[in-house]
Curated annotation (Swiss-Prot):
GO biological process: double-strand break repair; error-prone translesion synthesis; response to radiation; translesion synthesis; UV protection
Residue sites binding Zn(2+) 2 per the record: 805, 808, 820, 824
The protein's name: DNA polymerase eta
Species this chain originates from: Drosophila melanogaster
This protein's encoding gene: PolH
Positions with biased composition (Low complexity): 766-780
Disordered: annotated segments: 599-653, 658-677, 722-783, 846-870
């Protein structure tokens, strides 16, 4: 075993008490808790795959009693147990989502953590607890009389090698009276230095069983889930004991019963020996059971295997496991995977990118959640995949450092790893088809490190990523005021909103003053009349432009459009909320100006409709957004980004400001946003780019085609394509013929049922039938049957073109009757020839048995005479064709 885990010293190998808590049918219990009506009923949890009812991943004990097992299909379970309840695993990102089961496992772990700090979660439904400290404390209390074991604490408790827990307790009680009663047996099996720990082994395990009962009771009370437990001196023995008595039971594995258990325990049942390493051990040592390893010395095992694995095998065969219970409340890695069996193999680059995106999205979400809960970050990523190379499945695993945590970076890293470690990634001559199909794909991250309190880069990264997602989805512009409000928590919402509008209007005044440069009234501008504000100036310019030039305002300026700001001000007016004097006056002016603009646009709408087509196109290019009244009538929604750009252009046109020239780099959209848009588009319509679903286009300019006479389709003018197309039509014609034949046969069978049954005929025996076993009467299907007269048909067919066959009584068309009769003649001839040959061979064999020492020539003559004699009784095929009608 090559693992970098902590270990205890060899001197303390029998001092520990380790407890394994294993949840009973955990997935089924989670479903029963969510659906109480499923309790006490056969239940199974199935995967999302709908083929044959889905794959079963968990079965409760009521369904197991009916023969239902894991890895069955849902339909098979229904056949064995019709009343079974099949619960579907939630499906997210086109794969199973087990988040609710992980959350339930964390709920159980929170209860277990109260009993000891040495808690190691092995999986969603398993956890190791080192309760040595608790056992030592209770041993001291027992010696002082402050603690005593009670029978009710050992309910549903079993001990390996003992009929009942009472026998095990009696043995421990007798040993208290005579502590050295088993020393002779112990000295033969254990080292002299280990005898004190061996003598106290059983009582320590019994106290551990009482602690296990308390743990299981607490889990049941606080979570509602039932669990089993195994109590032993190390992790491997505790896991073995936990599975011996289930459900809702606990088992003690005494130290002295380990050897007898290993004598009949297969090697694969030991943790760490269930895979390829266990197979290598069995083949190398020629063993089957774990107890057979004891006969090998440590040196032999180290020579056959490496030093570390040899020592580990030597110890575990004697029930010794030095691996410590490492405190691990959280998982060491976060991963997700998906299989693609059969026709679902990934054969296209677009398909691979899609599924890498789905897996990366789940990894990203779980990393973000894990950081919030556990304050840690992953530094390592592993990509696992299985390829179909020349008909064989080749599994590969590649790893790399993980620096960025967004979905795009994980997809890019995963794809680069697969490309770099595949000899030929794309099929020759193609840019989108994979050379080797992928049957399995998985991504996992690990090597977590705790983030210090002063390190906030990761948190900022997730915040920026969330903001980027909001911008892509269009939610960011509406959230800008909210961000400003969150920065100033002491101010009220009303005050902040009014201050925002006041600052906005003041900024608009300054921009208008800069754009105009010199006012229309220089004296007034020089005097700086305080009563003339920005709104009045704009209204004056607007009326002057409409009156003198007759221009039509095609779009409302961005400052006064009936947008979020004006709607908010109207709402403030209706509700009666009072703001500052400046904001109230500006809001009234803005509302009044907006109403006048709408009226002007309504009056000039007819003139606007009479404009030429070129002017309409020019106006639509200049002003991308319509007035609010027109957009509401059309019932169309506009993109917020497009609206902002168009209003900005209108502002430049109306105020006369020359927009600044932008470079090519500035004109390009945001790289991050463009990449996220590509990801979103690939997720939505990735199936359209599947290589395996691509239909080749027939280019008539390169390959000439001819028209099919039957279906009118254009076919390439080549021999192979023509023959394939003709075979297609022939197959269709043959299928139609077979269907018509089947319909005729069904019709004839119904007619036969309606006819009256004919009385059976008595068979006539020939006079010489008893004289020889070979001179029998001709069979019923002989050639002579062809010349016999047949009785007339009792009932004529309804179709005058049909006649009844004298042989098979079937109604055949008159046109097809000669061919049908030839079939019967040929069949009867074949049967006659086969029977004739059989009689000849049988007679020859019998005569050889009677006279085995006859000379070769004489036996040949007799064989020829036998053939001539046997054939004289029946007509030969030559005689049949030579006789006259």
């Amino acid at each position: 075993m090559s693992s970098a885990r902590s270990h205890v010293s060899m001197q303390n190998k029998y001092d520990r008490v380790v407890l394994l808590v294993d949840m009973d049918c955990f997935f089924c219990q989670v479903e029963e808790k969510q659906h109480p009506e499923y309790r006490n009923r056969p239940l199974a949890v199935v995967q999302y795959n709908p083929w044959r009812g889905g794959g079963i991943i968990a079965v409760n004990y009521a369904a197991r009693a009916k023969g239902v097992t894991r890895h069955m299909r849902g339909d098979e379970a229904k056949d064995l147990c019709p009343e079974i309840v099949l619960c579907q695993v939630p499906n997210i990102r086109e794969k199973a989502d087990t988040s609710k089961y992980r959350d339930a496992g964390k709920e159980v772990a929170n209860v277990l953590q109260r009993f000891t700090q040495l808690l190691e979660r092995a999986s969603v439904d398993e956890a190791y607890l080192d309760i040595t400290e608790t056992v030592n404390h209770r041993m001291q209390q027992m010696q002082s009389g402050a603690f005593a074991l009670q029978p009710q604490e050992l309910v549903n408790t079993f001990a390996v090698g003992y009929p009942s827990i009472g026998d095990y307790v009696n043995k421990i009680t007798n040993r208290f009276a005579n502590p050295y009663m088993d020393d002779e047996r112990y000295q033969m099996s254990y080292d002299q230095n280990d005898l004190p720990a061996v003598r106290q082994s059983d009582i320590r395990l019994l106290i551990g069983a009482s602690v296990a009962g308390e743990v299981r009771a607490a889990v049941k009370k606080e979570t509602g889930y039932e669990c089993s437990a195994g109590i032993a001196h190390n992790k491997i023995l505790a896991k073995l004991a936990a599975g011996m008595n289930k459900p809702n039971k606990q088992t003690i594995l005494p130290l002295t019963e380990t050897a007898s258990l290993f004598d009949s325990l297969p090697v694969g049942k030991i943790k760490g020996l269930g895979g390829k390493f266990g197979e290598v051990v069995c083949e190398t040592l020629g063993i089957k059971f774990m107890g057979q390893v004891v006969k090998f010395s440590e040196v032999d095992l180290q020579r056959k295997f490496d030093e570390k694995n040899g020592t580990w095998l030597f110890n575990i065969s004697r029930g010794i496991d030095l691996e410590a219970v490492t405190p691990r409340f959280y998982s060491k890695s976060i991963g997700c995977c998906k299989k693609f069996p059969g026709r679902n193999n990934i054969t296209g680059l677009k398909t691979l990118q899609h599924w890498l995106g789905e897996l990366s999205s789940e990894i990203n979400d779980r990393l973000e959640k894990d950081f919030i809960e556990n304050n840690r970050r992953a530094k390592h990523m592993v990509v696992q995949y299985v390829q179909d190379i020349d008909g064989e499945e080749v599994a590969s695993s590649r790893s790399t450092a993980l620096r960025d945590y967004d979905q795009e970076s994980i997809v890019r890293l995963s794809l680069d790893l697969i490309k770099a470690n595949t000899k030929t990634f794309l099929r020759p001559g193609s840019e989108s088809a994979l050379n080797n199909a992928i049957k399995f794909l998985g991504i996992s991250v690990g090597k977590f490190e705790t983030v210090s309190s002063g390190q906030n880069k990761l948190q900022e990264m997730f915040a920026n990523q969330a903001a980027k997602k909001r911008r892509v989805s269009g939610d960011e512009p509406g959230q800008l005021p909210k961000v400003e409000m969150e920065k100033k928590q002491k101010q009220t919402d009303e005050f902040k909103m009014k201050s925002f509008f006041a600052n906005y209007l003041q900024g608009a005044k300054k921009e208008d003053a800069k754009a105009d440069g010199i006012s229309a009234n220089p004296l007034a501008a020089a005097a700086g009349a305080p009563n003339k504000n920005f709104v009045e100036e704009y209204k004056h310019k607007l009326h002057a432009a409409v009156r003198t030039e007759g221009t039509v305002l095609t779009s409302t300026p961005a400052e006064f459009k009936e947008s979020f700001f004006s709607q908010y001000l109207k709402q403030q007016k209706k509700t009666g909320q009072q703001g500052s004097v400046t904001s109230r006056e500006d809001s009234l002016d803005v509302q009044e100006l907006a109403e006048e603009l709408d009226a002007i646009e309504a009056d000039n709408s007819k003139d606007f409709e009479e404009d030429t087509e070129e002017e309409t196109e020019l106006t639509s290019d200049t002003h991308m957004s319509k007035p609010e009244g027109q957009s509401s009538d059309a019932g169309q929604e506009q993109d917020p980004n497009t609206l902002n750009d168009s209003t900005g252009n209108d502002l430049y046109v109306e105020t006369g400001i020359v927009p600044p020239t932008l470079t090519e780099d500035e004109l390009k959209p945001s790289t991050s946003k463009r990449k996220f848009d590509e990801i979103e588009s690939s997720v939505s319509n990735y199936k359209e780019c599947y290589v395996e679903f691509a239909v080749p286009n027939l280019r008539t300019d390169i390959l000439p085609t001819i028209k099919c006479d039957q279906c009118g389709a254009n076919i390439p003018d080549e021999v192979k394509s023509l023959q394939t197309h003709r075979d297609h039509h022939f197959a269709q014609e043959l299928s139609r013929t077979l269907r018509s034949t089947e319909r005729e046969e069904r019709t004839q069978s119904r007619q036969k049922i309606s006819l009256k049954p004919t009385p059976p005929k008595k068979s006539k025996k020939t006079a010489g039938s008893g004289s020889s076993s070979y001179s029998t009467a001709p069979p019923s299907n002989s050639i002579t049957k062809f010349f016999r007269a047949k009785p007339t048909q009792e009932q004529a067919p309804s179709d005058p073109q049909m006649n009844q066959c004298p042989e098979c009584k079937a109604f055949i068309k008159c046109v097809d009757m000669p061919e049908h009769l030839d079939y019967h003649v040929a069949r009867n001839l074949q049967r006659e020839l086969n029977q004739q040959d059989l009689r000849t061979r049988t007679a020859a064999l019998n005569k050889e048995k009677i006279s085995p020492v006859q000379p070769k020539k004489q036996s040949q003559k007799k064989l020829n005479s036998t053939i001539s004699a046997s054939s004289s009784g029946t007509k030969t095929i030559a005689q049949f064709f030579s006789q006259s009608n």
